[in-house]
């Protein structure tokens, strides 16, 4: 075990580790969202819900960092470069390559793979919001207040039945 980090799983056969510093960032992201951004933008929720939403956002942030690092790792593996581990830490993540890329083109492709995954993930998220036909704030509002969505749908159903009769 690497000092100050813990293995949390494997992806592509590569050990995924979380460094102790990750927990500091997790707490800072969660607390800043729960005590600042979320109450200001989604008023009226319980404190527990703000903290839960902040924690989910922090986990998703680090999930995106992990996918970014897996992008680097995947391309490195296509060049038969072994990856000893991926570590998530305070400044993001790092894919530990056991050797240097064989040529500049391979090095460039490995380097650009992580940002390409991040751009693709961002486009996927924007596309999902666009396909849902609502802005990000509206989507967050629906996630935060699902009972209001259900009530509106029930009301619409009631009105529709009365109009048909």
Where are these regions (language model features)?
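Short glycine-rich loop/turn motifs that provide flexible caps or phosphate-binding loops at active sites
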Residues: 12, 91-92, 113, 121, ...
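N-terminal low-complexity segments that are often proline-rich with Ser/Thr-Pro
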Residues: 137-165
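Small-residue-rich helix-interface/hinge motifs
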Residues: 1-32, 36-38, 43-44, 50-108, ...
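Alpha-helical transmembrane segments of multi-pass membrane proteins
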Residues: 106-117
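Hydrophobic transmembrane alpha-helical segments that form the core helix bundle
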Residues: 115-142, 152
């Amino acid at each position: 075990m690497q000092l100050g980090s813990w293995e949390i799983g494997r992806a592509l056969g590569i050990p995924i580790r979380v460094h102790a510093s990750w927990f500091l960032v997790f707490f800072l992201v969660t607390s800043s969202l729960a005590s600042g951004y979320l109450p200001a933008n989604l008023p009226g929720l319980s404190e527990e819900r703000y903290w839960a939403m902040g924690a989910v956002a922090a986990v998703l942030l680090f999930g995106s960092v992990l996918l970014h690092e897996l992008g680097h790792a995947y391309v490195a593996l296509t060049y038969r470069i072994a990856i000893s581990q991926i570590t998530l830490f305070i400044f993001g993540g790092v894919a530990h390559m056991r050797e240097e890329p064989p040529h500049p083109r391979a090095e460039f492709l490995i380097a650009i793979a992580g940002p390409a995954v991040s751009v693709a993930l961002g486009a996927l998220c924007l596309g999902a919001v666009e396909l849902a036909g609502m802005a990000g704030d509206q989507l967050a509002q629906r996630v935060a207040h699902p009972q209001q969505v259900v009530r509106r749908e029930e009301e619409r159903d009631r009105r529709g039945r009365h109009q048909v009769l």
